[in-house]
Structures are given as structure tokens and as C-alpha cells.
Curated annotation (Swiss-Prot):
Principal location class: cytoplasm
Subcellular location: Cytoplasm
Source organism of this protein record: Geobacillus kaustophilus (strain HTA426)
Residues annotated with N6-(pyridoxal phosphate)lysine modification: K268
GO molecular function terms noted in the UniProt entry: glutamate-1-semialdehyde 2,1-aminomutase activity; pyridoxal phosphate binding; transaminase activity
Cellular component, GO, one term: cytoplasm
GO biological process assignments: protoporphyrinogen IX biosynthetic process
Protein name: Glutamate-1-semialdehyde 2,1-aminomutase 1
Catalytic activity entry: (S)-4-amino-5-oxopentanoate = 5-aminolevulinate
EC number: 5.4.3.8
Length: 428
């Protein structure tokens, strides 16, 4: 493949856009650098770049394009919004319809509020939890990404009883001191942290199924223990379901796992590709939010007709019979094919998969936490990424990210991808 136009456009972008990209995850820095491919069109499971190259897409915009690019039902909803007005600044009937759909799908959402992104949703759930409890500290888990607000860009201290340190320039140490970070899937470290800080903890923030250092499932009893220990200390539990909501079933990962949080943050996937976020939970906690309570949250774009109509259409698609069975069937086919080629080539490969989402780790060990994910071979992944790109397979440019299958992918797409994996593995 030739990427002449992509390279030219990247040089131009560097003159006008910081780093040439509008999100660091779009950079190829983690896979050896170079110009990222500039995409021009997307349809179904496919991308076409500015040089005319076609790709099977497993990025799916980091998850939300679960129905496939330009799905006709979602596209029609967006057209309807364009014709009737995309932003009102007033209540609309559509936001009520959408709120009811979310509540019916995820029973723990007794009340909801729309925002514009997953970052906003997480940020606000923390504020609401602080307002409800009168406390300031939060506990989160190592390697889990919860957006780019100051309070969640905090790295772990030297141990479970140690406060965090800033994980980004511009985050004051005073904010990092409000965060305790512990390893995912480690109940005893969490218990130790709560024994030390529990009386000051407003909330425990957790991905019920990790999506941000790869697809990682909770160990049996882990989420139940978080609820028990947190509630014993008077802290709330917040689930970040920005990636997991509606990805594995019609509802949240909490439905699938049978464990309910006090508050839930959502984003990405519920908008069908348009910017949106939402948060919700127990009514008595949500009544802390203005105009009913003292916790302020507002947004001109929140609940805008375009995003809400696209979200309604997306959930209508996902509610159809056989949707998640299709994703699971193709996911299993892809996983089996990848592992078969890895065995044939003698490569250290572990695949973590749940239904239509998976992560390929270049390691022999089972990946259940962030440190194990870190030990996955990044140099090997970088070579693999570029070999796959040359064969027309678009993956996220990071060893930590998931491959996302959409409703638009077919068995032929998966078969082609498995063949490409085999060719790539033989060159590693």
C-alpha cells in the first residue's frame, strides 16, 4: 500500500493541529511513529483512506460504532435531526424517550442525566458522590482510563495505602492527593486501601470489565467484594461503563455480571457515533444534582436532539434479535484463528475476549491486571500493527487497545483477517 496523500496531509496537519492529531490515541507514537493513515470515508465494516486504500476496520472509533459505519437507521435519525434542528437549548420529547430506554435496559439507573462525553459523565459522578457523602477522596484501579479530567489522571503511589501522584503535566499534586490507586482484580490491596482511607473515600471508581488496558474480566467475587467493602465504609461505587455499556449485551456489563453500582457513567456507544454521555443511579443520590440539589452540572449541548436521536436509533438496532450472538460468533471465530496461527508460529500470544471485543497480547501469561498487560511485548505489537495495516486491516495503534467487531462484519471479513494475521505472524 502507498500512503503518499496521508503523509502529505500529516505534514500539513502538524503545521496547524497540535501533534497533527486531535487525540493522542490517533498518533502512531506507540507503534514506532510515522504518519497516521488519514481516512476519508467509512461504510459498514470498512474504511477508505485518502489514497484510495480499503481497510477492514476493528477500531470502530474505540468501540462506539457497534452497528457499523453509516448504519442506515442511525443515518436516517441524524438526517431527521439535521432537518428539524440539531440544538435547541430547551427540553425535547426525544430526551425523555431516550432516558426511558436507558432505564429499562439498566435497572440501577433510577434517574439519569445526559452530558456530552464519557469524560464529563465520570467527572460528574465523582462530584455527585462527593456531594452525597460529604467526602473528597476516590479510589480507582491501576491502568483504567476514565477520561482526561484532573482527578482521574493520577498514577498509583508506592502501595495501596499511599496517595497518588499526577499522571499528566498540569494536574496539581493537591488533586492527586485525593486519589488512591490500587491494582485491578486485587481484593486485598483494595481492602488495605479502604482500611487506611475508607472514612475519607466518597467513591470507588471501577470499570466492571476493563476496556482500557485491553479486555480484562473481573475475577469471580471481585466486584462483589468492592461493593461490600466500599459500602461498609460508607463509600459509593461508580461503574465506568463508557466502553462496556451495550457492548456485550443489551444493557450494561453490570447486568451481565449481576452486580449493581450506586452510580453509572456512560458515553460513546449510546450515541451511535455522535458525541454524548450520560450518568445515572439511585434516585436519592441523583437528587443531589441541580436544580434539585447542590451539586452543579450543566451543558448547552447536553441532550441535544442530534445525539439523542442517533442514540435512540442505535439502541433500536441493538435491541434486535441475534445482535449479540452475531458478535460473539465472529469474535470466537477470530480468537480461534489468531491462536491457531500463534501456535503454528511459536509466538507468545494471549487473547482476552468477551463476545465481539478482544485484545491480542504478545505474552505467554494470562492478563488479569495492568502490570501483566504492561509486560506484553510492545515492539512485537508495533511490527504486527504495521504488517496488518499493509494488508488492509485497521487496528488501534496501541498494544493495550481492543479489537471491536461490529454488526457489519461478516464471516468473510473474519476469514480474511485471520489469513492476514497468519501472514503477519510468519514475518515476526
Amino acid at each position: 500500500m502507498q500512503w503518499t496523500k496521508s503523509e502529505q496531509l500529516y505534514k500539513e496537519a502538524l503545521q496547524h493541529i497540535v501533534g497533527g492529531v486531535n487525540s493522542p490515541s490517533r498518533s502512531y507514537k506507540a507503534v514506532g511513529g510515522g504518519a497516521p493513515v488519514v481516512m476519508e470515508r467509512a461504510q459498514g465494516a470498512y474504511f477508505w483512506d485518502v489514497d484510495g486504500n480499503k481497510y477492514i476496520d476493528y477500531l470502530a472509533a474505540y468501540g462506539p460504532i457497534i452497528a457499523g459505519h453509516a448504519h442506515p437507521h442511525i443515518a436516517e435519525a441524524i438526517r431527521r435531526a439535521a432537518e428539524t434542528g440539531v440544538l435547541y437549548g430547551t427540553p425535547t420529547p426525544h430526551e425523555i424517550t431516550f432516558a426511558k430506554m436507558l432505564k429499562e435496559a439498566i435497572p440501577s439507573l433510577e434517574k439519569v442525566r445526559f452530558v456530552n462525553s464519557g469524560t464529563e459523565a465520570v467527572m460528574t459522578t465523582i462530584r455527585v458522590a462527593r456531594a452525597y457523602t460529604g467526602r473528597s477522596k476516590i479510589v480507582k484501579f491501576e491502568g483504567c482510563y476514565h477520561g482526561h479530567s484532573d482527578l482521574v489522571l493520577v498514577a498509583a503511589g508506592s502501595g495501596p495505602s499511599t496517595l497518588g501522584t499526577p499522571d499528566s503535566a498540569g494536574v496539581p499534586p493537591s488533586i492527586a492527593q485525593e486519589v488512591i490507586t490500587v491494582p485491578y482484580n486485587d481484593v486485598e490491596s483494595f481492602r488495605e486501601a479502604m482500611n487506611v482511607w475508607g472514612e475519607q473515600v466518597a467513591a470507588v471508581l471501577v470499570e466492571p470489565i476493563v476496556g482500557n488496558f485491553g479486555i480484562v474480566l473481573p475475577k469471580p467475587g471481585f466486584l462483589e467484594a468492592i461493593n461490600e467493602i466500599a459500602h461498609k465504609e460508607g463509600a459509593l461505587v461508580i461503574y465506568d461503563e463508557v466502553i462496556t455499556a451495550f457492548r456485550f449485551m443489551y444493557g450494561g456489563a453490570q447486568n451481565l455480571l449481576g452486580v449493581e453500582p450506586d452510580l453509572t457513567a456512560m458515553g460513546k456507544i449510546i450515541g451511535g457515533g455522535l458525541p454524548i454521555g450520560a450518568y445515572g443511579g439511585r434516585q436519592d443520590i441523583m437528587e443531589q444534582v441541580a436544580p434539585l440539589g447542590p451539586a452543579y452540572q450543566a451543558g448547552t449541548m447536553a441532550g441535544n436532539p442530534a445525539s439523542v436521536l442517533a442514540g435512540i436509533a442505535c439502541l433500536e438496532v441493538l435491541k434486535q434479535e441475534g445482535v449479540y450472538e452475531h458478535l460473539d460468533r465472529l469474535g470466537a471465530m477470530l480468537e480461534e484463528g489468531i491462536l491457531a496461527h500463534a501456535r503454528q508460529c511459536g509466538l507468545p500470544v494471549t487473547v482476552n475476549r468477551l463476545k465481539g471485543a478482544l485484545t491480542v497480547f504478545f505474552t505467554d501469561e494470562k492478563v488479569e491486571n495492568y502490570k501483566q498487560a504492561q509486560r506484553s511485548d510492545g515492539e512485537l505489537f508495533a511490527k504486527f500493527f504495521k504488517l496488518m495495516l499493509k494488508q488492509g486491516i485497521n487496528l488501534a495503534p496501541s498494544k493495550y487497545e481492543a479489537w471491536f467487531i461490529t454488526l457489519a462484519h461478516t464471516e468473510d471479513d473474519i476469514a480474511y483477517t485471520i489469513d492476514a494475521v497468519g501472514k503477519a505472524f510468519r514475518q515476526l
